[in-house]
């Protein structure tokens, strides 16, 4: 029997400083999990945002991002980072982090979402 889940991690930036958030998901031992990963910012184009994506599965992100890491500036709602149908075997881990350098002091929010079926 399959189980659908969604995990959110969100941070709101309210001052002129750097904010950082991360989400780690580990697939249940003995089960494969198919996940979709999304990272986006609101409002768009307010500050530079960097994104990192890592996994303990050797070479598994290479087809999506060579080197298993991605940095994009700026990350906006219209071109949010998306990885679809990423397969994790039981016990595999995916680590997603995002940071915003809120230079203008404008209230902004970054959200990481991992959605999947186990």
Task: Describe the residue ranges of each PLM region.
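C-terminal interaction-tip segments
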Residues: 1-32, 90-91, 98-118
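Short proline/glycine- and polar residue-rich coil/turn motifs
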Residues: 13-16, 72-78
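A structural signal for the main folded, soluble domain(s) of proteins
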Residues: 27-29, 45, 71, 82-84
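Hydrophobic residues on conserved beta-strands that form the core of alpha/beta folds
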Residues: 34-36, 83
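Buried hydrophobic-core signal for structured, non-transmembrane domains
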Residues: 36-40, 94-96
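Extended, low-complexity, turn-rich repeat/linker tracts enriched in Gly/Pro/Ser/Thr and Asp/Glu
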Residues: 40-50, 99-107
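Short, surface-exposed beta-strand/strand-loop-strand elements in extracellular ectodomains
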Residues: 45-67
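Beta-sandwich interaction modules
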Residues: 74-91
């Amino acid at each position: 029997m399959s189980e659908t889940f969604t995990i959110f991690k969100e941070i709101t930036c309210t001052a002129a400083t750097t904010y950082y958030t991360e989400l780690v998901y580990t697939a249940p031992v003995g089960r494969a999990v198919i996940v979709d990963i999304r990272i986006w910012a609101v409002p768009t184009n307010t500050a530079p945002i960097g994104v990192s994506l890592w996994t303990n599965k050797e070479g598994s992100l290479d087809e999506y991002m060579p080197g298993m890491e991605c940095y994009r500036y700026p990350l906006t709602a219209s071109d949010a980072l998306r990885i679809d149908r990423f397969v994790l075997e039981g016990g595999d881990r995916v680590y997603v982090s995002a940071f915003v350098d809120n230079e203008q002091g404008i209230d902004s929010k970054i959200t990481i979402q991992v959605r999947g079926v186990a």
